[in-house]
Structure formats: C-alpha cells, structure tokens
C-alpha cells in the first residue's frame, strides 16, 4: 500500500512538473509566434480602442506593462485582447492622465486582471470616471505611486524605461500626461499620452527625446506634434491611435502633412486595428514588416 502511494505520488509530481513546463512554453510561444526569429523580444501591442488609448508592453523577461485602458465601452475589449495574448496579470499599470478615453476602461480591467501596482500622473480630476478608478484601486489594495521626472522604471535590467513628463498642478490634463521613453539596446520608443505643445516645448528643452518610434500625442490633434517636436524626436515611424469616425477631426491634416513632409512612416489603428511592434534591440518589426532604422 505504501509502495503504491509513493508510486502515485511520484507520477502526480511528474505530471504537475510537465504541465507547468508546457504551460509556460505555450504561453511564451503564443506571445512570440509571429516573431520566432527574434530572440528575447520586446513586444508592444497598440490596441485599437476607438477614440482612446491603450497599449501593452511585454518585456524580454516576460514582465508586462499596461498603459491606459481606453474609454468605458472598451474596457472589456482590452481584457479580451490581453487574454488573447495569454496575459492574466499586469506587473505595472500606467495611468497616463485622468481623461475618460484613457482611464474609463481601467475599472473593468482592474476587476478582471491582477494588477501588481499602478503608476499615476498625479493629476487629480473631478470626474466620475476618475473617482471610480481611484476607488477601485483602493478597494483592490493596488498600490499607487506618482510618477516623478527622470524616474527609472525597473522591471527588466535590459530595458530602460524613463519618465520624461508627469502631472503638475498648473498643467492641463493633457499636459500632465506621463511620457515614457523605452530604450532596448539600439531601439528607442517614445510614448506620449495626450501632451500638447507646452509639454512638448519642455521636453525639447530639457530631455533627450530622440527615438526611432513615436506614439503621436493626443491622437494627432492640431494642438500637438509640432514641427520642432518632430525634429527633436526624429522618428522613423509614427503610431497613431484614433477612431475613423471621431468627432474631433483627428488626426488633423496639418499633423499628417508634417509627417508626410518629413518622410515618417505611419501606422494607424484606423487602418491596421491592433498594431504589433517587436524588436530585439537591433532590428525593428511593425506589423511583421521589418522597418530599417538608424541606431
């Protein structure tokens, strides 16, 4: 009887080991299937959430960063997209600023996905969506820290993530947006929230914002993406997130004219839906297409 019990115990232990092993590999493979020729990739998925913003980064070591959650109606959409990527937990949630098209969907996300911690812009706002977002974080006991200028986000030793802009009392919601520069070896990506020209001018003056990939601020609004800002960033690629039938005229024709004049390649959620970016720190692929960039 004891021998049988030991045998069953051994078989069960082996079963658990291989189940965990293959489960891990299935998840890892599912995240990198389209870029199997890249080892240790940094992946960014810019989600199509209509007239809003949401994106997720999967760092080379497997850590995950969710930036914004779209509006209220798209919270469930973000959850489905995360699950398709086999993401059931988020190591860091970045709430760039308190506008509803960025934080509205976070209530559903926090209810469905385990969030380890939140990085917030520090900009307070008197709105129902902002109140519910803060209340849910409190009820879920999710720690919130306020982003500080030049703060380093330490999640993967091979990827530098730096805060270049965050909330100030004198700033509007948009100009309080958290701006992140993500650098993986030779490749840099600038993620800009909804900043407008005032914040752009401060970044030009005080920060190194040069990057091969630029997430265009404020959905391509005329209030952002000045010529001086584009010269300072000097991107090869621009990512734009907006709804085709939005009521704001995004992206503004003046912004698109500047991008075209400077020869900056554009990827839009209107055209592509979700946009996939993958890099090993040397080569850059967007929508499975290699994009030649200068290091």
Model-derived features: positions:
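Non-globular, low-confidence helical/coil segments that flank catalytic cores
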Residues: 2-295
């Amino acid at each position: 009887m004891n021998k049988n019990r030991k045998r069953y115990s051994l078989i069960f232990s082996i079963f658990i080991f291989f189940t965990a092993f293959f489960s891990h590999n299935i998840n890892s493979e599912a995240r990198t299937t389209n870029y199997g020729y890249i080892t240790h990739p940094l992946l960014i998925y810019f989600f199509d959430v209509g007239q809003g913003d949401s994106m997720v980064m999967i760092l080379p070591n497997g850590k995950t960063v969710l930036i914004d959650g779209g509006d209220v109606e798209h919270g469930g959409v973000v959850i489905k997209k995360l699950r398709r990527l086999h993401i059931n937990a988020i190591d860091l949630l970045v709430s760039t600023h308190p506008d509803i098209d960025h934080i509205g969907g976070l209530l559903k996300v926090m209810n469905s996905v385990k969030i380890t911690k939140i990085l917030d812009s520090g900009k307070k706002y008197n709105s129902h969506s902002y109140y519910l977002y803060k209340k849910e974080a409190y009820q879920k006991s999710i720690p919130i820290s306020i982003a500080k200028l030049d703060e380093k986000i330490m999640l993967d030793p091979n990827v530098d993530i730096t805060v270049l802009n965050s909330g100030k009392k004198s700033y509007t919601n948009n100009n309080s947006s958290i701006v992140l520069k993500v650098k993986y070896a030779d490749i840099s990506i600038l993620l800009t929230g909804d900043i407008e020209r005032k914040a752009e001018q401060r970044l030009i003056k005080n920060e190194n914002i040069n990057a091969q990939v630029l997430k265009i601020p404020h959905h391509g609004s005329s209030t952002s993406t000045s010529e001086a800002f584009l010269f300072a960033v000097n991107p090869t690629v621009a990512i734009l997130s907006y709804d085709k039938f939005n009521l704001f005229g995004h992206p503004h024709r003046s912004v698109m004219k500047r991008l075209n004049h400077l020869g900056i390649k554009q990827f839009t959620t209107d055209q592509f839906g979700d946009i996939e970016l993958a890099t090993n720190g040397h080569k850059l692929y967007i929508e499975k297409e290699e994009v030649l960039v200068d290091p």
